[in-house]
Amino acid sequence: MALKQSNARRGHAAITSPLFAALLVVGAIFMAACSGGAAKVVTFTHGAVTPTTIVLGTDGGAIGAVRTFHADAKADDGKSGTFDATMVTTAVDAAAGLETRLTTIVFSFSDGADQLILSGSAVYPAAGSTIKTAATVVRPVIGGSGRWAGARGWAESTHEADGSWTHTFHLEP
């Protein structure tokens, strides 16, 4: 009878051993797939921007004020494109001189086939149409098309001292 138990244990070990090996292989593949790689960094620049403000009777310092921006842009690979943005004021703190604004920015290249989009809210000085120079805002990347289809990650938008802008995208692999 002891011999039969021993064979049963060996049989059980033979069944679990391939199963265990298969689980190890699947686990290794899963870990490799999830480990990803290094984030891809893409940088766009453009000159100073002047908004078109849409709120009758104000300079834009009101909830619901809409500012639109357009500028020629350049990618770090030398390609030329455009920068388009819409900014909506969603809250005003008059005592602090600050506004919360929701912004969507689209960088478009290759006649619009390649677009990278970021969107998010930030606090701005009420007196200006943009963040102060030498300041940076971080926003999520919400998508893209063409070359950047399925893009996700985050972007830093920096208002440079000379009035120009640098937008650094950190795209997940």
Across the structure, where does each feature detected by a protein language model lie?
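Targeting-peptide/extracellular-domain and disordered-appendage signature
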Residues: 5, 34-173
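Residues at the start of alpha-helices and the adjacent loop-to-helix junctions
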Residues: 13, 19-20, 138
